[in-house]
Amino acid sequence: MKAQELREKSVEELNTELLNLLREQFNLRMQAASGQLQQTHLLKQVRRNVARVKTLLTEKAGA
């Protein structure tokens, strides 16, 4: 997910995206803890996407 794609979304869409990412992050962490996760790079990707969305929400709140 690119930052430019996220910038085009509204605050409501960003909140929905954040909720989906947090759910995905939780599921990935559970898979990793149980040893079922093969693609460990997904944890890093999702964590950074969460940070991107939170950053944009903060920017939009200030503007």
UniProtKB/Swiss-Prot annotation:
Molecular-function annotations in GO: structural constituent of ribosome
Cystine pairings recorded for this chain: none
Stretches assigned to coiled coil: none
Domain of life: Bacteria
CDD domains for this protein: Ribosomal_L29_HIP
InterPro entries, per the entry: Ribosomal_protein_uL29, Ribosomal_uL29, Ribosomal_uL29_CS, Ribosomal_uL29_sf
GO BP, one annotated term: translation
Similarity comment text for this entry: Belongs to the universal ribosomal protein uL29 family.
Keyword set includes Hydrolase: no
Entries under Pfam families matching the protein: Ribosomal_L29
Origin organism lineage: Bacteria, Pseudomonadati, Pseudomonadota, Gammaproteobacteria, Enterobacterales
UniProt source species: Yersinia pestis
Name under which the protein is recorded: Large ribosomal subunit protein uL29
Gene Ontology terms: cellular component: cytosolic large ribosomal subunit
Alphabetically ordered keywords of this record: Ribonucleoprotein, Ribosomal protein
PANTHER family per the UniProt record, alphabetical: 60S RIBOSOMAL PROTEIN L35/50S RIBOSOMAL PROTEIN L29 (PTHR10916), LARGE RIBOSOMAL SUBUNIT PROTEIN UL29C (PTHR10916:SF0)
Keyword Cytoplasm in annotation: no
